[in-house]
């Protein structure tokens, strides 16, 4: 008897589980909300860090194992979990929907034009190619860009902004260089590319012009204290 399994989400977790199940003899169908499989490997990590051909090669390898991947399938809207279980015959479902919701700082001016979450910015650059002429979702090109945060995602966003023509790109981080959560090599690459680090600096307001566009940011100087959550 063929045992049917479903995976919701074609990111790293979902694809890994799909491959493992296929090797164990299960018939696996993966449902992906976006138009391509790969999840954060496709929309989050820039091409200069992870060539998309590598991701596509891995996805094709899963298909050769017998894994079916259906894109543009938003489970909960196109199909429900109950329908997958009752109508489609899946006996188990692995939910790998990711953690894609952004978290903002809750300061004035966050709704101004030109303020992006890292997820939105990187998705527009990496997946939607919004920097190309004629894009239906064009990304704002700027001479100066500030990226708030000090992790690997912040480094990716800053380096993308530099490649899109920004003359000055700042990493704004509330603690010191030694406390940056990004990997050391990512910080070094950013420094080599001319990214400016403004540490012990915390934004308190995003400033806008008469057209509702970002024109600056008010920050306060911080003092290094005990680590918090």
Question: Would you name each region that the model predicts?
Answer:
Residues 97-111, 115:
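Flavin (primarily FAD) binding-site architecture
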Residues 2-3:
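Short, small-residue-biased leader/transition segments that mark boundaries at the very start
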Residues 14-15, 154:
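N-terminal Rossmann-fold NAD(P) dinucleotide-binding loop
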Residues 8-12, 149-151:
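Glycine-rich Rossmann-fold phosphate-binding loop(s) that bind the pyrophosphate
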Residues 18, 22-23, 42, 158, ...:
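Gly/Ala-rich phosphate-binding loop of Rossmann-like dinucleotide-binding domains
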Residues 26-42, 170-178:
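Glycine-rich FAD pyrophosphate-binding loop
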Residues 53-103, 129-135, 163-229:
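A Rossmann-like FAD-binding core segment of flavoenzymes
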């Amino acid at each position: 008897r063929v045992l049917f399994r479903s995976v919701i989400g074609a990111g790293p977790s979902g694809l890994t589980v799909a491959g493992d199940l296929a090797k164990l003899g299960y018939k696996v169908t993966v449902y992906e909300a976006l138009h391509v499989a790969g999840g954060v490997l496709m929309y989050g990590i820039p091409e200069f860090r992870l060539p998309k051909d590598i991701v596509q090669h891995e996805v094709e390898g899963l298909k050769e194992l017998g894994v079916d991947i259906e894109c543009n399938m938003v489970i909960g809207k196109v199909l429900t979990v109950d329908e997958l279980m009752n109508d489609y015959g899946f006996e188990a479902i692995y939910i790998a929907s990711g953690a894609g919701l952004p978290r903002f700082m809750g300061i004035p001016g966050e709704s101004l034009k030109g303020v992006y979450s890292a997820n939105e910015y990187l998705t527009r650059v990496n997946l939607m190619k919004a920097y190309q002429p004629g894009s239906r979702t064009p990304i704002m090109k700027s001479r100066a860009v500030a990226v708030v945060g000090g992790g690997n995602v912040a480094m990716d966003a800053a380096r993308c902004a530099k490649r899109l023509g920004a003359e000055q790109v700042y990493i704004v981080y509330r603690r010191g260089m030694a406390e940056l959560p990004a990997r050391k090599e990512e910080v070094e690459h950013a420094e080599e590319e001319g990214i400016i680090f403004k540490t012990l600096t915390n934004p308190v307001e995003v400033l806008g012009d008469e057209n509702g566009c970002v024109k600056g940011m008010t920050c306060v100087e911080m003092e290094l204290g005990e680590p918090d959550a």
